[in-house]
């Protein structure tokens, strides 16, 4: 494989800078304005959030060994899930009972947005200070040109390395299904008659369940193959999508949310650590750029499938169940990857 070592830019610095800009965008959500202003802020916050994750994910190669990577990645996701519940619960409480304690809904929303922005930065600073980067070379001239050139070479190298390429392809399909279920869950719950409070509580339950479930995956990864655990998680999501065919009651939606929480952290954390183990450490930044493009930019396919099938059949249940195809394709390709040396 053609190797191009990472340009000497500090991942922790860029991750912190991206998080700061993303948090500023989030904190500014409460400022009155029209929908175009809000959309611009939302896009900025989302872009910088995703950029910060590219560098955050690529740090995995520097902070642990291959043997401990599955465990570290899973515990990281677990702590992230339970940690995010704190500002979520406070924000939810403000929105639900704010008027009873003298806050208008706009004031409650303002406090919620600022609280989440501060929380984001507060827990980004420690890793920015303590992280020690191992793999990079001296800074070169024409950094922007070099960066895009290196991204192009990483993509070319990924195509040459069949295992990396096929994993990214498998990941694109099955994670598309995962993120589609996450993104479309509120719309689906609304169609079943859940009010805003019910939807938020269901999402909170998913986060809470994901905490111990991710820790269980961390324990299992020490005893067994991460490939087998990823396959189990993909098949579980396939069953979740198929279950949606007959879903027409609120308690079934809650059961679905619980099942998603059981496997969400596992499939995300083990996919990240598996990818980290098959890429060259020196180019982890560029490769994780490809990884996050496949992940964060994937859910359009599942959303299109749901909309298209729902339009044809007139039944949203069948539309949601259609994304089971994505899990089958992802499983088939990943099964080939797991058999490669």
Indicate residue ranges for each PLM-predicted region.
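Juxtamembrane intracellular "pre-TM" segments in multi-pass secondary transporters
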Residues: 132-168
């Amino acid at each position: 494989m053609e190797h191009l070592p990472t340009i000497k830019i500090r991942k922790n610095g860029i991750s912190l800078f991206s998080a700061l800009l993303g948090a500023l965008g989030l904190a500014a959500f409460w400022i009155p304005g029209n929908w175009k202003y809000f959309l611009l802020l939302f896009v900025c916050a989302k872009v910088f959030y995703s950029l910060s994750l590219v560098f955050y994910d690529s740090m995995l190669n520097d902070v642990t060994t291959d043997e401990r990577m599955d465990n570290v990645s899973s515990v990281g996701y677990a702590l992230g899930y339970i940690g995010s519940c704190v500002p979520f619960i406070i924000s939810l409480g403000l929105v639900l009972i704010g008027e009873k304690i003298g806050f208008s809904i706009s004031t409650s929303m303002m406090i919620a947005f600022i609280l989440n922005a501060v929380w984001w930065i507060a827990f980004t600073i420690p890793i920015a200070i303590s992280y020690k980067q191992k793999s990079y070379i001296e800074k070169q001239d024409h950094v922007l040109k070099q960066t895009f050139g290196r991204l192009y070479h990483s993509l070319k190298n990924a195509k040459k390395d069949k295992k990396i390429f096929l994993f990214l392809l498998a990941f694109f399909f099955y994670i598309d299904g995962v993120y589609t279920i996450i993104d479309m869950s509120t719309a689906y719950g609304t169609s079943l008659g859940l009010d805003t409070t019910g939807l938020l509580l269901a999402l909170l339950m998913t986060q809470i369940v994901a905490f111990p479930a991710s820790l269980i995956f961390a324990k299992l990864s020490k005893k067994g193959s991460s490939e087998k655990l990823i396959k189990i998680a993909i098949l579980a999501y396939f069953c979740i999508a198929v279950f949606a065919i007959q879903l027409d009651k609120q308690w079934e939606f809650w059961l679905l949310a619980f099942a998603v929480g059981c496997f969400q952290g596992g499939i995300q954390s083990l996919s990240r650590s598996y990818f980290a183990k098959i890429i060259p450490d020196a180019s982890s930044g560029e490769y994780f750029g490809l990884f996050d493009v496949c992940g964060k930019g994937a859910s359009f396919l599942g959303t299109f499938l749901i909309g298209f099938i729902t339009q044809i059949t007139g039944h949203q249940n069948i539309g949601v169940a259609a994304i089971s195809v994505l899990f089958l394709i992802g499983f088939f390709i990943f099964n080939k990857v797991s058999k490669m040396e």
